[in-house]
Structure formats: structure tokens, C-alpha cells
Amino acid sequence: MSRQTQAIIHADALLHNFKALAAIAPSSQSMAVVKADAYGHGAVNVARILQHVSSQFAVAIIEEAIALRDAGISAPVVVLEGAHQAKECQMAFQHNCILVMHCEEQLQWLNNCPENQRPHIWLKVDSGMHRLGFAISDIEDMTKKYRHLLSEQTVIATHFACADDVDNGFTASQLSAFKRVADAIGLPTSVANSPATVNWPASRNAWNRLGVGVYGGAVSTANNVGVEIYPAMTLRSSILAVRTIAAGEGVGYGQRWVASKPSKIATVGIGYADGYPRHCKNKTPVMVRGKRAFLAGRVSMDMITIDVTHIDNVSVGDEVELWGQNVPIQEVAACADTIDYELMTRVSQRVPRIVKYL
């Protein structure tokens, strides 16, 4: 490996975070959500790391589930978007996947499958987010009409719009609306994602779906959430070149950064083709030789430039942390006007994922 741009995946952090979040709800079962290639961390590796603590996994689409099966992951897999086409019902049965059904068309597809070749299903209720799910007013009738498709593994699920915001009352209204129909139907429920598990005790039901928190992402607007989680990814690269420029000289495309004094500029081998956000502003932090340096100029496809004037002995080959244990990913996301979820999932496939234990 010539280029030193890598995403280090911290296996111990993944295990710690999952166990810490699951411990908040000891009466519930918890599953790790590994959709979007485990939020950019590598779904197969993450599933292998967590398979002894997470009895099920969740993905978004059937292709993600099959990739786990092809890698030898045998635990049940919940497909959160259900079937996109009728043929996926058969695929789910063949691969021991649980489909989360959110509309009657999907139930009709399932009904058309041979009776002995139907996968287990969950049912999703729209409690107010208005993306996917049966309407609150329809779900009881749907469970009666399609009772023959349900099994001992069927769960009623919903999803929150604002669970990370402890001051937003909409989550309480979603919980109340969902609880009314769930109590009437009488099936086990799955409500909590990572933020809800931390912030909303009433949402901790039969199954909690632990996603971004497992990877060290932000789970709450509160300052003290009562659980300590650690970043599971360190994105790092190395310095390709160091040069000194005079006051008044510009750096990068568009000359967006201009030196106010003689400055030392380091070029780093990572860019937006690797998933480092192009919209990062000047002064976005990185870590070099134990000190913070700052973005100077626009992010290029394959490189960034940083101001290291204040750091001694910077040289070619020095490691640069873009985010991770010393530079919080949330801070970088704020500099790019986005969220940590997006940064994690956009790390491109040309960046190797290197799994490490402490």
C-alpha cells in the first residue's frame, strides 16, 4: 500500500459502544444496524466484530443482507425498507431475512408467495415522520386482514424524527400515538434507535435498533447523556509536500485562502474523491504531530492543503488525522454544514478500512 490514506476501524470501540448502549436497556434486545456498509465502517467486518453481542443485524436493502450472508454471517437480518420488488420476498426467505413491510402492496407480494416459502416480517407504522409505514388509522385493519402472514417473530416498529433532541416534544407525541395502536394489536414492538435508547426510556421495547451510536456518532443534544461512547473510525492520511509561501500568496483552486504572513503549507493526500467533504471551510481542524492544524484553501479531488506555520518539524510522510480520536467527526461535519452520519457513509471505497484492536 503506497498511499497512506486509511480509515482505521477500532474494533474495541465498536464493542464498547454497542455494549454500553445495550446496557441502558437490559430488558430489551438490541441489534446493530449495519446499513450503508455499516455507516461507512465496512459491514462485513463490523458484523464479524459484533456477531457475539448482537443477535440480529439490520440493513436497509436486501442486497446488503445478501452481502452479509455471502461473507458467512448467519444471524437473522432485518431489512428495514422491506421489499422493493415482489421477487425480494422469495430472496428474503432464501437468505433468512426479516422484511419490514410498510405498505399493503408488499403484503400482497408476500401473500402471493408459496405458503411454505414466506419470510418472517415486521410491520412498520408511520407515527408522524411520514416517510414509510402504515398509517396509524390503518394498521389494526392490516394486521387483521393479513393475520395469516404474521408469525411469532412479527414485530410492530416505528421510527422517530427528533429522538436526538431532548427538548423536542414531537418524540413524546409519536410515542403516545404508536403505543395506542401497539397495545391494541398486542405484538412486540421496536421503537428506539440509538438516540431514543439514550434519551427516551419509554421507547426501550422488545428490540432496540442501534446505529450511529455504535460508531461513535452523536446521539443527543444533552450535555450529559449518561453513557460514554468512542469514535470507531479514525480517518488519516499523510503529508505529501511542505512549502513556504510569502504573505499575499494564495493556495488552491480559486485562491480562497491567502496568506496574511509568511506561511508554511503542507499538502495532504486526501480529497473529496476519498469522501473528505469539499464544503469544509478554511480553518477546519486536523491533527499533525500532536497539534491542531487548519485547512487552508479549497478541498481538491485528491488533496487538501493545511496551514502548519505554528508546528515545528513538519515533514513529508507525517501522519495527519482528519477525524477520529483527536478531532471529533462532529466538529468536521459542522465545518462542512452537514452531519456526522454523512461523513461516515461518504468515505469512498478507495480508502482501505483497516480493522485494529487496542
From Swiss-Prot:
Query: Cross-referenced PROSITE patterns, in alphabetical order?
Result: ALANINE_RACEMASE
For this protein, what is any one GO molecular function term?
pyridoxal phosphate binding
Q: What is the name attached to this protein's record?
A: Alanine racemase
* Active site annotation, chain numbering: 35, 253
> What biological-process terms (Gene Ontology) are attached?
D-alanine biosynthetic process
Identify the species of origin.
Answer: Alteromonas mediterranea (strain DSM 17117 / CIP 110805 / LMG 28347 / Deep ecotype)
The superkingdom listed in its UniProt entry is Bacteria
Under the heading InterPro entries, the entry gives: Ala_racemase, Ala_racemase/Decarboxylase_C, Ala_racemase_C, Ala_racemase_N, Ala_racemase_pyridoxalP-BS, PLP-binding_barrel
> What is this protein's gene name?
alr
Q: What does this protein do?
A: Catalyzes the interconversion of L-alanine and D-alanine. May also act on other amino acids.
Which residues carry the post-translational modification N6-(pyridoxal phosphate)lysine, per the record?
35
Cofactor(s) listed in the protein's UniProt record = pyridoxal 5'-phosphate
* Gene Ontology CC: one annotated term: cytosol
Q: Which family does it belong to?
A: Belongs to the alanine racemase family.
User: EC no.?
Assistant: 5.1.1.1
